[in-house]
A protein has these predicted regions:
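Short, surface-exposed amphipathic charged segments that create phosphate/polyanion-binding patches used
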Residues: 113-115, 194-201, 255-272
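Short, aromatic/basic amphipathic alpha-helical patches
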Residues: 232-242
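TOPRIM metal-binding catalytic domain and adjacent DNA-binding surface shared by DnaG-type primases
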Residues: 1-26, 41-43, 48-127, 135-138, ...
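Short, acidic/turn-prone active-site loops that include or flank metal/cofactor-
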Residues: 183-189, 226, 250-253
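Phosphate-handling DNA/RNA-contact segment within nucleic-acid enzymes
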Residues: 105-218, 234
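Short recognition patches in nucleic-acid-associated and regulatory proteins
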Residues: 26-37
Length: 275
């Protein structure tokens, strides 16, 4: 199919494509597993099957302006509270974290469905809203999430920072008083063999964007999921942050939120303390 540069040469908007790395080797050759996000510095790609990721720079000086995301009005009063409680999270403990509720259209759905949106950015500059259906596993995104979720809600003097794989995991930890953030784009399928280059590290640009916060913290807890992609993400984060500063959590559940839901706040606190 050609290189990523060739495949993305004519792309000028966020989309999904066939992955040139793995699509021909799969049984379902026509499934578009390569997500492409247009950023200020290039076209960021990530394959949700083989884990291939990177950034293709723009030819010349052509850069698409990233438009700010407008938040829709709240159309479902109580929906966010209902969702958080269903995940074992006390809403009053995470009120400063931007989560909105409403009805959203997802690909593959016949009509709009109830959904919650995790808001990225600041009140004056919303950069993305990541939506998930309440009753389905449907996901979609408005804008481009390129920073840690919850980074703007952290205490300025945070000494221990927990990094999670999903927004609900970060909310679960914050609800019991543990400062935590979530990566914006999930976990890779495997650890990349590419050398880490901060100037060309599109998928993990959020790590470099939070460098000041990370450097101030004396201890970074990697609280990614208890599966192979979660281990790969923990490894990729440690490569960029520095292994001497990182500790890995072992959860009794699948992740932080499941641990809170199935084992309780004490078990979640214990897992972090014993990292």
């Amino acid at each position: 199919m050609g290189s990523f540069e060739n495949v993305l040469s004519s792309v000028n908007e966020d989309c999904r494509l066939l992955c040139p790395e793995c699509s021909q080797e799969r049984k379902k050759k026509n499934v578009k597993t390569l997500s492409v996000t247009i950023t200020e510095n290039g076209k960021v790609y990530h394959c949700h099957h083989c884990g291939a990721s990177g950034k293709v720079p723009y030819a010349g000086s052509v850069i698409r302006e990233i438009k700010p995301v407008r938040l829709p009005p709240e159309t479902e009063p109580g929906l966010v509270e209902r969702f958080l409680k269903s995940r074992g999270i006390e809403p009053s403990k995470v009120m400063s974290y931007p989560v909105i509720g409403g009805r959203k259209f997802f690909r593959g759905q016949q009509d709009e469905i109830e959904a919650v949106g995790f808001v990225y950015g600041t009140p004056g500059e919303i950069t993305a809203v990541k939506w998930r259906g309440l009753e389905t596993k449907a996901f979609t995104q408005d804008g481009a999430a390129q920073e840690f979720y919850g980074i703007h809600q952290l205490p300025k003097d945070v000494d221990q920072l927990v990094i999670c794989e999903g927004e609900c995991d970060a909310l679960a930890l914050n609800s019991i008083g543990i400062p935590a953030v979530s990566v914006p784009n999930g976990a890779p399928q495997k650890v990349s063999r590419k050398q880490v280059d901060p100037s060309d590290d599109g998928k993990y640009g959020y790590v470099w964007a939070a460098r000041e916060t990370i450097e101030k913290a004396s201890r970074i807890i990697l609280a990614t999921d208890m599966d192979d992609p979660g281990e790969a993400l923990a490894e990729e984060l440690a490569r960029r942050i520095g292994r001497a500063k990182c500790w890995r959590v072992t959860f009794p559940g699948k992740d932080a939120n499941d641990t809170l839901l199935e084992h309780g706040a004490e078990a979640l606190q214990k897992a972090i303390d014993e990292a």
